[in-house]
C-alpha cells in the first residue's frame, strides 16, 4: 500500500496520456492557448483568421473572442500531457510549460525536469516519496530510468563525482518559501544513505547520524517563521560533504553567511524570532525554568508578537528533538546549559527598561531586576554591568572619563549587545558542529557542496539584510545564466562546431555592478563603506550620495511614493524592490559597547567568556574577529589595520563561495512557490510565470533542445562504446578523432544528432542515454554468452569426472570379485599366515638400531639445549645492544629530520622575503608613477592659478566700469519702472504660462530623450513600415480621390440641374455625400502628411524645441518653421486639388460626353476650378507677405541681441582676467601641496619598506641564531654518542655548516638593512617636519583662496542678474502685447504638436511591442519547427534502420526455412535408413530366438555337465541377455524415429504456413511503410518549403533592419557629434575649474589624514622601537648567560639597566616630540609596572641560576664528584636553552605586537593595550612552563651521566660562541647610539621646520589682510546695489536662496549657467 501511494506521486497515469478521444479532440478543434487574466493562459479553438487578428472559441464557456495572432500560442498534443522532461515538448512556449507544471502539480507530481536542471513546486503538504524504499529505488539508476526526483539529481551528482573525479555542487535556488531548505535536507538524507561506510541499513554510522542531525540544530537556532514561510532560513549555508576515493563520507563542513541577528530583538507583524526561543519557553521543565529564570511569553519585550504558533508543529516536542540532536552531535551537557543560559540572557536583556531623568537627557534604570537576572545568567557583576551601560568609560586625551548615556543610546547599547551575543553563540555552534563532523582521519578526495541560502525577498520596505540576500541571489542567478548559456556556447565555439551564438538577454551584471562595483562609479556597498568613514555621515547623506552617483543607472530608480516610504529602488531580476536605508550605517559598522564586551570577556561563566574571548577585536577595525576566523573559514585574510565592515566581509565571503561554485560542476534545482497563502493544491499562474521568466527556464530548455548538452572526450568515447562497433576500427594506432568518426559511422547515427569537436564528441539530449542502453544490452549478451561457455565447460568437466569414477568403480568391482574367489583357497590362506612372520625378525633388528640412534639423539639434544641456552643469553645481550643502537639511530634520524625541517623553513622564509622584496619594488614603481602624476597635476594647478589672477585683474577693472555704468543704468531703470508696473501683470501671466509650458515641454522632452533610444531601435522597422504605409496611403488616396471626385460631380450636378432625370438627381446626391467625405479625408490627409513630416523631423527638432521655448528668438524661429510647414501643406493641397481636378475632368469626359447638359456642367466646373486657383494664389501671396514681415522682425531682434551679446562678452573678458589671477595663486599653492605630498609619499614608502625588511630580517636573525645553537648542540651530541654511525655524523656536519653559512649571510643582510633603516629614518624625520610646515601654509592659502572665490562668485552673480534684468526689460518693452498673442498662439500650437507627438509615440511604441512579440513568436515557432524537423529526421532514420533490420530478419527467415527443408529431407532419408535397419534387426531377432530355443534344449541335455560347462553356459546366457537388450533398444529407437518424423512433418507444415503469413504481412507492411514514408516526405517537403520561405522573409527583414539601423546610427552619430561640439565650448571652463577645486579639496583632506596618521605612527613606532630594543638587550643578555654563567649574569644586569635608562630617555623624548603620544600614558605606566613585576620575577629566576652557578663552581673544584658536577652542568645548560627559547618567543611576539600596534593606532591604542595584556598573560604562562621544563631537564640530565667528557667539550664550544655573542651585543649597542643620534637630528630638523612655518604664517596673515580689504570693497558694492530698485532685489534673493541649498560645485555651475544665458 505504501509503495502504491508513493507511485501515485511519482509516476504519470498512462491511460490519461494515451486517451485517443483527447487526441482526436485536439486535432479536430485546432486547440491553441490564448492569454487569460485569471489563469494566465486558457485553451481555445481556432475558428477563423482575419488579418492580424484571429477569432477563437474558448473551451471553458464556448465564448468567441477576437485575439491578436501574436498572443496565440500553440498547444502540444495530448500525448505530451504531464511530460516528465519539458525539453520533449514539441511546442515550447510559456503556456505549454505552465500547463505542464500545473497539471503535474495538481496530480501530486511536484518534480519536473526542465532540460539540464530540475523544477520543484512546493506542495505545502507531506508526500510519501522520501522513505528508505524510495531511496533504494533511485540508488544507482540512470536519470531516464526513474521519474523526476531530488534523489535523481543527487544520485547524478554523486555518480558524476565518482566517475569523473570532479567536485560537484547542488544549488537549490528560489524565492523565500519555495522549499529550498527541505530539498537540501533530502539531498543530505540521500547521500548519508548511499555513501555510508556501514553496509547494513539499520546500523547507521555515527558520522552519518551527526550529519543528519546538524540540520535540525541549525534550523532551531537560525530559522524563523516569516509571512511567506513557516521555516524560513535567516542565514545562508554551504554544506560541503567530503568523500574518499571509494565514495564513502569521511567528513563535512558547514559555512554560514549573514545571520539576520536583528530578528533576535524585533520582528514584523505575524512573524516569529528564531525557533529556539519558543522551543525553550515551551519545552523546558520546571527545574530548568527556575535555573534559567524563564518567564511567560508576554513578559519578554524582544518577543514582539508574543506566542506565535506554527500550524502542525509542537514547540515542546521540537525542543526535545533539538536537545537529542545536540547529544548525538557530541555537545556535552555543560555546553548545552551554557547555550540555554545565553538564550535566556538575550531574552532578559530586552526587559531592561531605561528612563529619562527630569532635568537632563541622562538615562537611568529605575528597576534593575532584569539587569540582575542578566548578570546572574551571564556570570558578570550587576553594578559593573549597569555602570557600563549608563555611564561607560571612554578615553578623552590621555585620561578616561565616564560619559552619561541618553535613553536612546542605552537602548541601542542593549540591543546591540543582545544581537552580538546571539551572533557569537551561533558562530560558536557552527564551529562546534564542524568540529564534530570533521574528526575522521580519512582523507577526502572530492566533495559535494549543497547550497541553501535565503531566497529572494520582496517586502513592502526592505532593509540592509534584504539587499545582501537579493545581491546573493543575483550572483547565483548570474552563475546559472553564465553556466547554462554563455559557457555552453563558448565551449561550442572553442571546440569549433557549427553554432550561431544566441543572446538570451539574461545578463544580470549591470545590477550586480550597481551593488558591488568598487569604483567608476562606486556601487551601493562601496558608497556605504565610504560613508562609514565619515563621522558626521547619516543615512540621509548616504542616500543622497547613492542618488548622485547612481541616479542614471538603468537598474536604479528613485521612488515615486511619499517621503516616509522607500529611499531608492533597484530593479532585480525577480522584480523591482524598494529599499529603506534606515540604520544602514550602524548595521554596516556594527558597533558595540567596549565596557560590556570586556566585562563579558571576564565572565565567571566559562562558556560566556569563551564566546567573548576576542574582546580586543570587537569593532569593525582591525581584521575580522578571531572567532570569526575560525568559525568562518571562508573569511579572507586581510591586512591588519583595515576597516572591515559587514558589507565588505559579506562580499568577500560571497566571492569565495562563487569561486568554489565555479570550480565545481553545478547541478541546479529551481524551487518555485505556487502561492503566497501557503495553501496546498493551489497554484497562482501569474506568480509561477514570473518565476519561470526570471529563472530562465524557457531559455534553459531551448538551449538544451537546440544545443548539444552531452559531451564525451574522444578517448573515453572510444573506451566506453567500442564494444558496440567491434570491427569498425582497424588494428594498430589511430588518432582518437578518426576512431570516433569511424565508430559513429558504424553506429549509423544521424548527422544532426552529434557534432565532432577538437577534443570531444557532442550529442543532443537523449542520444548518449540511447547509446548507454545499447551498451548495456550488448554487455548483457556478452555476459550471457560467457556464462553459457562457463556452464558448458563445467558440465564437460563434471561428465569427465563421472566417467573417471565409473572406471574406478569397475576396477573395484573386478578386484572384489577376484578376492571372493581366492579367499577360500588353502594356499592363499597359508600365504597370508606365513608372510607376517618373515617381517617380525627384521623388525627386532630395526628396534635395536633405533634404540642406539635414540641414545645418540638424546646426547645431541642435551648438547643442543646447552648451546641453545648460551645462544639465548647471547641473543638477549645482542637484542639489548640492538635496542640501544636502534634508539640511537632513531634519535639521529629525528635530529636529521629536525635539521631538514629547519632547512625547509629557512628556504620558505627566504622565498617569503624575496616575495616581500618584489612587492616592495612594485610599490616603489607605483609611488614613482604617483609622483609623476602629482607633478603633472602641479603644473596644471599653476596654470589655473595664473588664469585666476588674470581674471581677478579683469574683474577689478570691470568693477570700476560697473560703477560708472551703474549711474546710467539707475536712470534707465527709473524710466523703465513705470513701463514695468504696466507690463508686470501681463508678464506674470506670461511667466506662469511659460513656466507651465516649459515644465510640460521639459517633461515631454525628457520622455522624448528616453524614447529616442527606443525610436532609434525602432527606426529600422519604422522606415520599412512607413514605406509600406506611404504606398498603401497613396493607393488609398487615389481610390478616395476617385470616389470623392465622382461624388462631387454628382452633388454639383444635383444643385445646378434640377430639371434632369432621376438618374442625374441620384448622382447629385452622391456628389454631395462625397463632398463631405472629401472634406474629412482632406483633414485626415493633412494630419497624415503632418504626422509623416513631423516624425521625419522629430529626431532633429527634439533638442531645438527646448532652446526655442527659452527665449523669444526661439519662438520666432518656431513660428517661421510652422509658417513654412503650413505653406508647404498649402502647396501640397494645391497640387492635390489640381490632380483631383484633372482626374475629375477625365472622369467627366468619360462619363458625361453624351449629353449637352453634361458639357455645360463641365464648363461650370472648370470656371469653379479657375476661381479656386485664383484664391489659392492670393492666399499664397498673403502668406509670403506675412513671412517677410516675420523675417524683418526676426532680423531686428537678432541685431539687438547681438549688441547685448557683445556687451556681455566684454564683461566676461574682464571677469576672466580676474579669474586667471586667482587661478595663478591657486597654482602656486597646489605646487607647494604637491611637493609636500611627493615628499611625504616618498618618505612613507621608504619607511614602510625598510620597517618591513627590518622586521622580517630580525625574525630571520633570531630564527637563525636559534637554529645555529640547536645544531651546535646536536652536532656535539652526535659526535660523542654515535661513533659507529660516521655516515650520519658527516651528513649532519654538512647540514650544520650550510646553516651557519646561511646565518652569516643573513647577518650581513641584517646589517645592510639596519644601515638603510637609519638613513630612511633621518629622511623621514626631515620630511615630516617639512610636511607639517607646508600643511599649515596650505591650509592658510586654501582659506584665502576660498574667500576670494566666494567674492568672485558673488560678483559674477550680481553682474549676471543685472544683465539678465536689463535684457528682460528691453524685451518686454519692445514686444508688449504682441508677445502675449504670439506666446498664446505658440502655446496652443505646442500643445497640439505635443499631443500629436505623444499619440504618435504611443502608437509607435505599441507597434514596436507588437512587432517584437511577433518576432519572438516566430522565432519560437521556428525553433520548434527546427526541433520537430530534427525529430522527424531522426524518426525517418530510425524507420530506415527498422526497414534494414526487417530485411535482415526476412533474409534470416528465408535461410532458416531453407535449413528446415534440408533438415526435413535429411530426416526422411534417415528414417528410411532406420526402417531398413529395423527390418534387419527384426530378422536378427528372430534368428536369436531360434538360437535361444536350441540353447535351452542343450541346457536340459547337458545339465549334468554343469560344472564343466559353467563358463560356456555363462557366456551363452550373457549373449542372450545382450541380444534382448539390443532388441529392446532397437525397438525404442524405432518408436523415437517415428515420433520425430511426425514432429518434423508438423513443424514443416507450420513453417510453410508461417512463411505464407510472413510474406503476406511483409507485403502489407511494405505498402504501409511506403505510404507513410511518402506522406512524411510530402509533409517534410511542405514544412521545409514553409521554413525556407519564412527564413527568406526573415532574412529580408533582417537585411532591411540592418540598413535602417546603419542609417539611424549614422544620423545618431552625426547628431551626437554636433551636440558634443556645442556642449564642449560651454563645459570646458566649468569642468576645469570644478575639477581643480575638487582635487584641491581631496588633496587637503588626504594631507590632513596623512599628517594625523604620520604623527600617530611616528609616536607609536618610536615607543615600540624603544621596547623592542629593550627586549633585544634582554634576549642577548640571556643568550650570553647560557654559555658563560657568571659573565652572562653580569652582562644581563648591565644590559637591563642600560635598556631601562634608554627606555626612560626615549619615553621622555616621545612625550616632548608628539602631543598625541601622551594619550596612552596612563596605560603605559600600568604596563610598565607590570613589566617591572615580571622583571623582578626574572631576577628571582636569575638568583636561582646564580645558586646553580655556585654548585657548578664547587663541582669544578671537586672533579672527583664528577656525576654531581655533570648534573649541575646539564641542568644549567638545559635551563639556558629553555630561557633562550622563551626569549626568542618573546622577541617574536613583541615584533608581532609591533605590527599590531602600528595598525591599531587609529583606534587609540585599544587593540595594542589588549595585546600587551594578553602578552603579559602569555609571559606568566611561559614562566610556569619554564619551571615544568626545568624539571624535565633534570630528568634528562640523569640519562647522560656517562657523557661528562663530551659535555666539557660542549662547554668549551659554548664559551667560544659566547664571545661571538658579545661581539654582536657590542654591535647592537653601537646601532642604538646611531639611532639616538638620528633622533636628535630629527628634532633639530623639526625645530627648523617650525621656524619656517611661523614665517609662512606671517605671510599668510598679510595675504588675509589684503583679502579683507577686497571683501570690504565687495561689501560696499553690495550696499550700493541694495539701494537699487525692487525687482533687482527680488531676483537677487532668489539666487541666494538657490545657492544656499546647493554645494559649492553646484553654485559654480549655476553661475556659469547664468553667464551663458546672459551671453545669449
Swiss-Prot record:
Superkingdom of origin organism: Eukaryota
Q: Which residues form a coiled coil?
A: 841-1926
Where are the Phosphothreonine modifications? 1939
**Region Actin-binding, annotated ranges:** 654-676
Residues annotated as binding ATP are: 174-181
- At which residues is N6-acetyllysine found? 8, 102, 299, 435, 613, 860, 975, 1024, 1234, 1249, 1357, 1392, 1404, 1410, 1459, 1638, 1793, 1802, 1845
Record region (Disordered) = 1035-1057, 1117-1167, 1327-1352, 1768-1788, 1877-1908, 1939-1960
- Mediates interaction with LIMCH1: annotated segments: 2-838
Q: Which GO terms describe its cellular component?
A: actin cytoskeleton; actomyosin contractile ring; adherens junction; brush border; cell cortex; cell leading edge; cell surface; cleavage furrow
Q: Where does the record place the modification Phosphotyrosine?
A: 11, 754
Q: Which InterPro entries match?
A: IQ_motif_EF-hand-BS, Kinesin_motor_dom_sf, Myosin_head_motor_dom-like, Myosin_N, Myosin_S1_N, Myosin_tail, P-loop_NTPase
Phenotype reported upon loss of the gene? Reduced litter size and increased polyspermy in the perivitelline space following fertilization.
Compositional bias annotation for Basic and acidic residues: 1035-1055, 1122-1148, 1332-1352, 1948-1960
Q: Which keywords does the record carry?
A: Acetylation, Actin-binding, ATP-binding, Calmodulin-binding, Cell adhesion, Cell shape, Coiled coil, Cytoplasm, Cytoplasmic vesicle, Cytoskeleton, Methylation, Motor protein, Myosin, Nucleotide-binding, Phosphoprotein, Ubl conjugation
GO molecular function list: actin binding; actin filament binding; ADP binding; ATP binding; calmodulin binding; integrin binding; microfilament motor activity; protein domain specific binding
Q: One Pfam family of this protein, by short name?
A: Myosin_tail_1
Q: What is its main location?
A: cytoplasm
In its record, the post-translational modification comment is: ISGylated.
Location in the cell = Cytoplasm, Cytoskeleton; Cytoplasm, Cell cortex; Cytoplasmic vesicle, Secretory vesicle, Cortical granule
Q: Domains: what does the record tell us?
A: The rodlike tail sequence is highly repetitive, showing cycles of a 28-residue repeat pattern composed of 4 heptapeptides, characteristic for alpha-helical coiled coils.
| Self-association state and partner proteins as the record states | Myosin is a hexameric protein that consists of 2 heavy chain subunits (MHC), 2 alkali light chain subunits (MLC) and 2 regulatory light chain subunits (MLC-2). Interacts with RASIP1. Interacts with DDR1. Interacts with PDLIM2. Interacts with SVIL. Interacts with HTRA3. Interacts with Myo7a. Interacts with CFAP95. Interacts with LIMCH1; independently of the integration of MYH9 into the myosin complex. Interacts with RAB3A. Interacts with ZBED4. Interacts with S100A4; this interaction increases cell motility.
What's the protein called, per UniProt?
A: Myosin-9
* Originating gene: Myh9
Amino acid at each position: 500500500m505504501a509503495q502504491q501511494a508513493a507511485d501515485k506521486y511519482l509516476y504519470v497515469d498512462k491511460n490519461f496520456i494515451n486517451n485517443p478521444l483527447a487526441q482526436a479532440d485536439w486535432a479536430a478543434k485546432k486547440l491553441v492557448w490564448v492569454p487569460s487574466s485569471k489563469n494566465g493562459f486558457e485553451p481555445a479553438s481556432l475558428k477563423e483568421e482575419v488579418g492580424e487578428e484571429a477569432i477563437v472559441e474558448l473551451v471553458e464557456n464556448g465564448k468567441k473572442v477576437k485575439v491578436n495572432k501574436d498572443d496565440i500560442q500553440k498547444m502540444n498534443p495530448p500525448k505530451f500531457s504531464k511530460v516528465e522532461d519539458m525539453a520533449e515538448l514539441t511546442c515550447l512556449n510559456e503556456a505549454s510549460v505552465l500547463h505542464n507544471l500545473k497539471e503535474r502539480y495538481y496530480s501530486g507530481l511536484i518534480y519536473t525536469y526542465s532540460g539540464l536542471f530540475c523544477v520543484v513546486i512546493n506542495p505545502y503538504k507531506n508526500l510519501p516519496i522520501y522513505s528508505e524504499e524510495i531511496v533504494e529505488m533511485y540508488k544507482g539508476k540512470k536519470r531516464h530510468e526513474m521519474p523526476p526526483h531530488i534523489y535523481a539529481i543527487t544520485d547524478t551528482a554523486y555518480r558524476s563525482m565518482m566517475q569523473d573525479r570532479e567536485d560537484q555542487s547542488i544549488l537549490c535556488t528560489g524565492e523565500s518559501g519555495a522549499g529550498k531548505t527541505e530539498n537540501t535536507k533530502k539531498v543530505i538524507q540521500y547521500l548519508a544513505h548511499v555513501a555510508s561506510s556501514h553496509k547494513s541499513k539499520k546500523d547507521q554510522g555515527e558520522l552519518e547520524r551527526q550529519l543528519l542531525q546538524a540540520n535540525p540544530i541549525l534550523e532551531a537556532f537560525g530559522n524563523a517563521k516569516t509571512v511567506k514561510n513557516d521555516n524560513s532560513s535567516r542565514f545562508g549555508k554551504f554544506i560541503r560533504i567530503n568523500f574518499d576515493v571509494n565514495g564513502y563520507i569521511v567528513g563535512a563542513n558547514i559555512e554560514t553567511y549573514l545571520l539576520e541577528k536583528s530578528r533576535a530583538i524585533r520582528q514584523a507583524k505575524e512573524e516569529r524570532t528564531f525557533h529556539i526561543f519558543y522551543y525553550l519557553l515551551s519545552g523546558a521543565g520546571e527545574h530548568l525554568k527556575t535555573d534559567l529564570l524563564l518567564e511567560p511569553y508576554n513578559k519578554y519585550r524582544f518577543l514582539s508578537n508574543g506566542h506565535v504558533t506554527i500550524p502542525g508543529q509542537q514547540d515542546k516536542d521540537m525542543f526535545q528533538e533539538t536537545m537529542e540532536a545536540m547529544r548525538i552531535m557530541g555537545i556535552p551537557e555543560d555546553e548545552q546549559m551554557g547555550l540555554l543560559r545565553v538564550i535566556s540572557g538575550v531574552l532578559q536583556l530586552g526587559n531592561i527598561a531605561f528612563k529619562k531623568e527630569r532635568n537632563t537627557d541622562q538615562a537611568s534604570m529605575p528597576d534593575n531586576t532584569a539587569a540582575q537576572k542578566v548578570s546572574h545568567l551571564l556570570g558578570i557583576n550587576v553594578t559593573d554591568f549597569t555602570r557600563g551601560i549608563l555611564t561607560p568609560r571612554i578615553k578623552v586625551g590621555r585620561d578616561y572619563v565616564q560619559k552619561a548615556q541618553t535613553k536612546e543610546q542605552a537602548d541601542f547599547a542593549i540591543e546591540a549587545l543582545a544581537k552580538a551575543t546571539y551572533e557569537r553563540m551561533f558562530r560558536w555552534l557552527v564551529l562546534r558542529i564542524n568540529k564534530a563532523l570533521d574528526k575522521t582521519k580519512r582523507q577526502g578526495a572530492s566533495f559535494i557542496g549543497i547550497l541553501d541560502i535565503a531566497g529572494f525577498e520582496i517586502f513592502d520596505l526592505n532593509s540592509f539584510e534584504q539587499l545582501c540576500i537579493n545581491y546573493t541571489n543575483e550572483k547565483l542567478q548570474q552563475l546559472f545564466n553564465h553556466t547554462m548559456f554563455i559557457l555552453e556556447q563558448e565551449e561550442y565555439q572553442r571546440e569549433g562546431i557549427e553554432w550561431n551564438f544566441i543572446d538570451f538577454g539574461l545578463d544580470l551584471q549591470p545590477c550586480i555592478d550597481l551593488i558591488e562595483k568598487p569604483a567608476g562609479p562606486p556601487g551601493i556597498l562601496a558608497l556605504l563603506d565610504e560613508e562609514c568613514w565619515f563621522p558626521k555621515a547619516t543615512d540621509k547623506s548616504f542616500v543622497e550620495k547613492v542618488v548622485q552617483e547612481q541616479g542614471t543607472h538603468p537598474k536604479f530608480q528613485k521612488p515615486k511614493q511619499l517621503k516616509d516610504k522607500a529611499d531608492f529602488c533597484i530593479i532585480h531580476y525577480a522584480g523591482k524592490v524598494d529599499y529603506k536605508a534606515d540604520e544602514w550605517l550602524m548595521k554596516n559598522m556594527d558597533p558595540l559597547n567596549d565596557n560590556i564586551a570586556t566585562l563579558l570577556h571576564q565572565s565567571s561563566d566559562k562558556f560566556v567568556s569563551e564566546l567573548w574571548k576576542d574582546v580586543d577585536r570587537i569593532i569593525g577595525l582591525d581584521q575580522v574577529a578571531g572567532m570569526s576566523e575560525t568559525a568562518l573559514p571562508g573569511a579572507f585574510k586581510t591586512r591588519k589595520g583595515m576597516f572591515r565592515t559587514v558589507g565588505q566581509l559579506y562580499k568577500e565571503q560571497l566571492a569565495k563561495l562563487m569561486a568554489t561554485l565555479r570550480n565545481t560542476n553545478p547541478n541546479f534545482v529551481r524551487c518555485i512557490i505556487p502561492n503566497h497563502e501557503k495553501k496546498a493544491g493551489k497554484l497562482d499562474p501569474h506568480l509561477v510565470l514570473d518565476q519561470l521568466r526570471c529563472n530562465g527556464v524557457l531559455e534553459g530548455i531551448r538551449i538544451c533542445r537546440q544545443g548539444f548538452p552531452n559531451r564525451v572526450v574522444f578517448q573515453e568515447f572510444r573506451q566506453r562504446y567500442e564494444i558496440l562497433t567491434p570491427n569498425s576500427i582497424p588494428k594498430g594506432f589511430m588518432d582518437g578523432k578518426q576512431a570516433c568518426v569511424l565508430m559513429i559511422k558504424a553506429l549509423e547515427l544521424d548527422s544532426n544528432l552529434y557534432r565532432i569537436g577538437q577534443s570531444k564528441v557532442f550529442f543532443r539530449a537523449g542520444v548518449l542515454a540511447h547509446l548507454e542502453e545499447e551498451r548495456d544490452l550488448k554487455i548483457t549478451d556478452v555476459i550471457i554468452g560467457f556464462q553459457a561457455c562457463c556452464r558448458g565447460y563445467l558440465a564437460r568437466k563434471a561428465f569427465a569426472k563421472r566417467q573417471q569414477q565409473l572406471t574406478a568403480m569397475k576396477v573395484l568391482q573386478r578386484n572384489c570379485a577376484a578376492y571372493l574367489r581366492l579367499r577360500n583357497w588353502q594356499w592363499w590362506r597359508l600365504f597370508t599366515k606365513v608372510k607376517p612372520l618373515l617381517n617380525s625378525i627384521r623388525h627386532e633388528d630395526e628396534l635395536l638400531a633405533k634404540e642406539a640412534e635414540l641414545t645418540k639423539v638424546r646426547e645431541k639434544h642435551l648438547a643442543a639445549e646447552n648451546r641453545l641456552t648460551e645462544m639465548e643469553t647471547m641473543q638477549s645481550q645482542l637484542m639489548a645492544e640492538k635496542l640501544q643502537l636502534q634508539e640511537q639511530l632513531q634519535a639521529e634520524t629525528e635530529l636529521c629530520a629536525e635539521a631538514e625541517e629547519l632547512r625547509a623553513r629557512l628556504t620558505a622564509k627566504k622565498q617569503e622575503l624575496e616575495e616581500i622584496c618584489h612587492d616592495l619594488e612594485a610599490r616603489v614603481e607605483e609611488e614613482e608613477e604617483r609622483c609623476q602624476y602629482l607633478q603633472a597635476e602641479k603644473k596644471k594647478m599653476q596654470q589655473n592659478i595664473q588664469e585666476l589672477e588674470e581674471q581677478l585683474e579683469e574683474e577689478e577693472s570691470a568693477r570700476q566700469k560697473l560703477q560708472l555704468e551703474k549711474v546710467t543704468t539707475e536712470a534707465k531703470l527709473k524710466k523703465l519702472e513705470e513701463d514695468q508696473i504696466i507690463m508686470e501683470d501681463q508678464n506674470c501671466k506670461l511667466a506662469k504660462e511659460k513656466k507651465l509650458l516649459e515644465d510640460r515641454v521639459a517633461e515631454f522632452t525628457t520622455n522624448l530623450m528616453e524614447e529616442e533610444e527606443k525610436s532609434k531601435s525602432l527606426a529600422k522597422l519604422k522606415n520599412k513600415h512607413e514605406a509600406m504605409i506611404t504606398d498603401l496611403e497613396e493607393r488609398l488616396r487615389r481610390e478616395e480621390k476617385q470616389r470623392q471626385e465622382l461624388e462631387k460631380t454628382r452633388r454639383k450636378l444635383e444643385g445646378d440641374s434640377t430639371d434632369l432625370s432621376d438618374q442625374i438627381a441620384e448622382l447629385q446626391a452622391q456628389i454631395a455625400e462625397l463632398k463631405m467625405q472629401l472634406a474629412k479625408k482632406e483633414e485626415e490627409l493633412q494630419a497624415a502628411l503632418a504626422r509623416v513630416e513631423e516624425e521625419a523631423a522629430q529626431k532633429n527638432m527634439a533638442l531645438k524645441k527646448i532652446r526655442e521655448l527659452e527665449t523669444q528668438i526661439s519662438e520666432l524661429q518656431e513660428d517661421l518653421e510652422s509658417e513654412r510647414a503650413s505653406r508647404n501643406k498649402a502647396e501640397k493641397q494645391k497640387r492635390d486639388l489640381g490632380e483631383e481636378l484633372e482626374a475629375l475632368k477625365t472622369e467627366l469626359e468619360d462619363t458625361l460626353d453624351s449629353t449637352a447638359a453634361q458639357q455645360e456642367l463641365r464648363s461650370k466646373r472648370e470656371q469653379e476650378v479657375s476661381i479656386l486657383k485664383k484664391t489659392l494664389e492670393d492666399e499664397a501671396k498673403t502668406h509670403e507677405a506675412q513671412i517677410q514681415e516675420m523675417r524683418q522682425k526676426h532680423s531686428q531682434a537678432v541685431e539687438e541681441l547681438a549688441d547685448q551679446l557683445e556687451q556681455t562678452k566684454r564683461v566676461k573678458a574682464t571677469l576672466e582676467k580676474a579669474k586667471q589671477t586667482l587661478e595663478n595663486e591657486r597654482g602656486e599653492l597646489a605646487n607647494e601641496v604637491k611637493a609636500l605630498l611627493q615628499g611625504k609619499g616618498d618618505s612613507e614608502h621608504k619607511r614602510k619598506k625598510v620597517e618591513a625588511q627590518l622586521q622580517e630580517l630580525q625574525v630571520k636573525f633570531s630564527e637563525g641564531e636559534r637554529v645555529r645553537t640547536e645544531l651546535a648542540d646536536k652536532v656535539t651530541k652526535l659526535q660523542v654518542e654515535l661513533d659507529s654511525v660516521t655516515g650520519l655524523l658527516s651528513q649532519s656536519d654538512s647540514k650544520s655548516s650550510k646553516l651557519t653559512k646561511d646565518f652569516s649571510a643573513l647577518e650581513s643582510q641584517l646589517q645592510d638593512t639596519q644601515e638603510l633603516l637609519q638613513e630612511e629614518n633621518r629622511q623621514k624625520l626631515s620630511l615630516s617636519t617639512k610636511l607639517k610646515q607646508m600643511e599649515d601654509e596650505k591650509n592658510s592659502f586654501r582659506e584665502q583662496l576660498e574667500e576670494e572665490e566666494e567674492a568672485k562668485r558673488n560678483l559674477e552673480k550680481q553682474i549676471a542678474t543685472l544683465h539678465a534684468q536689463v535684457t528682460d526689460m528691453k524685451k518686454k518693452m519692445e514686444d508688449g502685447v504682441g508677445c502675449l498673442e504670439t506666446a498664446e498662439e505658440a502655446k496652443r500650437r505646442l500643445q497640439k504638436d505635443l499631443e500629436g507627438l505623444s499619440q504618435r509615440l504611443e502608437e509607435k511604441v505599441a507597434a514596436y511591442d507588437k512587432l517584437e512579440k511577433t518576432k519572438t513568436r516566430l522565432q519560437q515557432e521556428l525553433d520548434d519547427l527546427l526541433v520537430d524537423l530534427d525529430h522527424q529526421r531522426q524518426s525517418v532514420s530510425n524507420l530506415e534502420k527498422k526497414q534494414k533490420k526487417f530485411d535482415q530478419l526476412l533474409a534470416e527467415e528465408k535461410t532458416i526455412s531453407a535449413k528446415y527443408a534440408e533438415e526435413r529431407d535429411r530426416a526422411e532419408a534417415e528414417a528410411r535408413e532406420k526402417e531398413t535397419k529395423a527390418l534387419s534387426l527384426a530378422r536378427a531377432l528372430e534368428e536369436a530366438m531360434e538360437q535361444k530355443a536350441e540353447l535351452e534344449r542343450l541346457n536340459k541335455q547337458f545339465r549334468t555337465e554343469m560344472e564343466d560347462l559353467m563358463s560356456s553356459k555363462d557366456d551363452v546366457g550373457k549373449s542372450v541377455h545382450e541380444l534382448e537388450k539390443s532388441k529392446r533398444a532397437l525397438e525404442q529407437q524405432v518408436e523415437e524415429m517415428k515420433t520425430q518424423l511426425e514432429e518434423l512433418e508438423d513443424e514443416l507444415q507450420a513453417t510453410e504456413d508461417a512463411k505464407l503469413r510472413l510474406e503476406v504481412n511483409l507485403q502489407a507492411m511494405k505498402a504501409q511503410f511506403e505510404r507513410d514514408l511518402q506522406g512524411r516526405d510530402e509533409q517534410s517537403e511542405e514544412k521545409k518549403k514553409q521554413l525556407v520561405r519564412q527564413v527568406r522573409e526573415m532574412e529580408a527583414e533582417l537585411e532591411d533592419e540592418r540598413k535602417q539601423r546603419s542609417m539611424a546610427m549614422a544620423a545618431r552619430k552625426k547628431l551626437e557629434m554636433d551636440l558634443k561640439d556645442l556642449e564642449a565650448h560651454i563645459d570646458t571652463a566649468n569642468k576645469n575649474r570644478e575639477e581643480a577645486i575638487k582635487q584641491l579639496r581631496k588633496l587637503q583632506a588626504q594631507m590632513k589624514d596623512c599628517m594625523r596618521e604620520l604623527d600617530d605612527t611616528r609616536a607609536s613606532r618610536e615607543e615600540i622601537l624603544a621596547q623592542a630594543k629593550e627586549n633585544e638587550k634582554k634576549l642577548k643578555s640571556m643568550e650570553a648567560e647560557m654559555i658563560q654563567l657568571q659573565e652572562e649574569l653580569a652582562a644581563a644586569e648591565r644590559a637591563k639597566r642600560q635598556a631601562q635608562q634608554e627606555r626612560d630617555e626615549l619615553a621622555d623624548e616621545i612625550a616632548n616630540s608628539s602631543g598625541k603620544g601622551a594619550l596612552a600614558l596612563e596605560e603605559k605606566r600600568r604596563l610598565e609596572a607590570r613589566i617591572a613585576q615580571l622583571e623582578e620575577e626574572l631576577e628571582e629566576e636569575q638568583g636561582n641560576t646564580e645558586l646553580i652557578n655556585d654548585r657548578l663552581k664547587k663541582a669544578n673544584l671537586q672533579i672527583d664528584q664528577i656525576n654531581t658536577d655533570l648534573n649541575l652542568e646539564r641542568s644549567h645548560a638545559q635551563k639556558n636553552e629553555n630561557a633562550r627559547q622563551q626569549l626568542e618567543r618573546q622577541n617574536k611576539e613583541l615584533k608581532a605586537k609591533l605590527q599590531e600596534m602600528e595598525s591599531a593606532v587609529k583606534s587609540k591604542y585599544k587593540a595594542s593595550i589588549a595585546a600587551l595584556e594578553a602578552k603579559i598573560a602569555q609571559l606568566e604562562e611561559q614562566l610556569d612552563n619554564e619551571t615544568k621544563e626545568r624539571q624535565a631537564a633534570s630528568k634528562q640530565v640523569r640519562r647522560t651521566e656517562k657523557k661528562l667528557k663530551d659535555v666539557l667539550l660542549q662547554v668549551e664550544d659554548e664559551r667560544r660562541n659566547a664571545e661571538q655573542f658579545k661581539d654582536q651585543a657590542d654591535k647592537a649597542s653601537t646601532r642604538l647610539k646611531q639611532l639616538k643620534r638620528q633622533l636628535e637630528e630629527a628634532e633639530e630638523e623639526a625645530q627648523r621646520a617650525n621656524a619656517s612655518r611661523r614665517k609662512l604664517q606671517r605671510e599668510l596673515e598679510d595675504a588675509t589682510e589684503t583679502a579683507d580689504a577686497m571683501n570690504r570693497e565687495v561689501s560696499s558694492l553690495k550696499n550700493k546695489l541694495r539701494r537699487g530698485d525692487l525687482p533687482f532685489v527680488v531676483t537677487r534673493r532668489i539666487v541666494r536662496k538657490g545657492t544656499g541649498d546647493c554645494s559649492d560645485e553646484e553654485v559654480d555651475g549655476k553661475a556659469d549657467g547664468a553667464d551663458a544665458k546672459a551671453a545669449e
